[in-house]
């Protein structure tokens, strides 16, 4: 599978062609991997597969609230901020302008993974960070915790954030008071002044917040020295990558469609666009250069924290999925809520993202079930509704219409080809394809790199 089709770069056109309108711009196409549910679908595994022959792997949104796990040579690496494709020594990793960066978190993550195995050796020389990416400060994280506490006290429930400062830093960005990587590396005196103003704003909003401004600035100066060689103009970097020699460029989405700030189950969402539009805005590239868009789907559904979950099984079935699937959040360690596959939500995610193919992961977790249910429609007041209610109170009231399929009651973890799967497992996959009208390209039947069955 080729990542990138190549068209002649504008600079290579003869002068006589300058005035002629061109139907499509030239350049390489990026391959995008996106979560199609509420996260934790196994995106890291798909990225790891595709990154083996990639040249550049990018992150375009989110921060270290995301959690991707990749297993290579029996070593389990955990990624939160770094693109997980960085474990390929030939890959250049790029963190785009749409990502928010907590510098202590970045270095801590890199050091932890360096100690685990050889995958991250020389990572500093292979990482490029957009100069337009915003910085998450410790007080953003502290404010995140205070906000959650206030929500709990005032409304009796919180949003279930990871307390990584993601909401507050995107709020600073939208309020135009945030600070970016370019500010840190270009003019530390100017950066310091703006940092003091922002810190004092936060102290006035949250009186209990303690900020050691001088101490923080001292730490940030140390990080500035380390990070400076990695910071570049991201727009120019990516333009050169798209319009230079053929390159395989991969974009690794964080979070997932139903956590998108606009299209997710608001307000129980993240603070960035984790759908395909976030690729263009978070990297600074035109939509014409988006190639394949792969949606990653778990064979059942999980969700961390609170919020609507129509197919949730708060019973023995949910418990069995939770224990068999070892469903704990990579970032928070929280137990994930579990339920049947929801095709209504997947159709909605496809409407927004236009998936060209799917990766269906964790099919082996369903091995124990004699019958498997799949959500195929929503009813409200006894009537089938053709859409997903945007309002959470209404979404909580929908009744799911299920299709029941026979299980396979067989261990499929050693299957390495589609034809090696039991007929009922094959039928489950084909049913999903037929309902969604999207081909399934990969099927995951275990944790290792080898346990991804490729269909075409």
UniProtKB/Swiss-Prot annotation:
Q: Record-annotated residues binding IMP?
A: 40-43, 65-68, 162, 176, 255, 270, 334
SUPFAM superfamilies attached to this UniProt entry? P-loop containing nucleoside triphosphate hydrolases
Name the pathway. Answer: Purine metabolism; AMP biosynthesis via de novo pathway; AMP from IMP: step 1/2
Catalytic reactions on record: IMP + L-aspartate + GTP = N(6)-(1,2-dicarboxyethyl)-AMP + GDP + phosphate + 2 H(+)
Asked whether the keyword DNA damage is assigned, the reply is no
Stated family: Belongs to the adenylosuccinate synthetase family.
HAMAP family given for it? Adenylosucc_synth, Adenylosucc_synth_vert_acid
Protein name, UniProt field: Adenylosuccinate synthetase isozyme 2
Q: Gene behind this chain?
A: ADSS2
């Amino acid at each position: 599978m080729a990542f990138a089709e190549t068209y002649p770069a504008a600079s290579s056109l003869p002068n006589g062609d300058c005035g002629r309108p061109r139907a499509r711009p030239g350049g390489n196409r990026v391959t995008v991997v996106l979560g199609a549910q509420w996260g934790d679908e196994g995106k890291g595994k798909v990225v790891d597969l595709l990154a083996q022959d990639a040249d550049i792997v990018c992150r375009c949104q989110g921060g270290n609230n995301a959690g991707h796990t990749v297993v290579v040579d029996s070593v389990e690496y955990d990624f939160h901020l770094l693109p997980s494709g960085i474990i390929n020594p030939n890959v250049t990793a790029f963190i785009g302008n749409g990502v928010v960066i907590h510098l202590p978190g970045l270095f801590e993550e890199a050091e932890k993974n360096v100690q685990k195995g050889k995958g991250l050796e020389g990572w500093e020389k292979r990482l490029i960070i957009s100069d337009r990416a915003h910085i998450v400060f410790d007080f953003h994280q502290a404010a995140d915790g205070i906000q959650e506490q206030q929500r709990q006290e005032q409304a009796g429930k919180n949003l279930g954030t990871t307390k990584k400062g993601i909401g507050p830093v995107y709020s600073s960005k939208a309020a135009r008071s945030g600070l970016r990587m370019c500010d840190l590396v270009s003019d530390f005196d100017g950066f310091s002044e703006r940092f003091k103003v922002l810190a004092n704003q936060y102290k006035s909003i949250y009186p209990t917040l303690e900020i050691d401004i001088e101490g923080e600035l001292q730490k940030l100066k140390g990080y500035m020295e380390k990070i400076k060689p990695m910071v570049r103009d991201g727009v120019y970097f990516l333009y050169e990558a798209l319009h230079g020699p053929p390159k395989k460029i991969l974009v690794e989405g964080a979070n997932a469609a139903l956590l998108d700030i606009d299209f997710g189950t608001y307000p129980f969402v993240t603070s960035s666009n984790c759908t395909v539009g976030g690729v263009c805005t978070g990297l600074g590239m035109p939509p014409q250069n988006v190639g394949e868009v792969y949606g990653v789907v778990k064979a059942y559904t999980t969700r961390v924290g609170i919020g609507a979950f129509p197919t949730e099984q708060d019973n023995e079935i949910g418990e069995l999925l939770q224990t068999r699937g070892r469903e704990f959040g990579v970032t928070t360690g929280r137990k994930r809520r579990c339920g049947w596959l929801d095709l209504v939500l997947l159709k909605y995610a496809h409407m927004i993202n236009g998936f060209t193919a799917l990766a269906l992961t964790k099919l082996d977790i369903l091995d124990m079930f004699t019958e498997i249910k799949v959500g195929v429609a929503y009813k409200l007041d006894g009537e089938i509704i053709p859409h997903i209610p945007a309002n959470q109170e209404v979404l909580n009231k929908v009744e799911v219409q299920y299709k029941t399929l026979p299980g396979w009651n067989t261990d499929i973890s050693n299957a390495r080809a589609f034809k090696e799967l039991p007929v009922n497992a094959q039928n489950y996959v084909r049913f999903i394809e037929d309902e969604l009208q999207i081909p399934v390209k990969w099927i995951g039947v275990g944790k290792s790199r080898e346990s991804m069955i490729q269909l075409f």
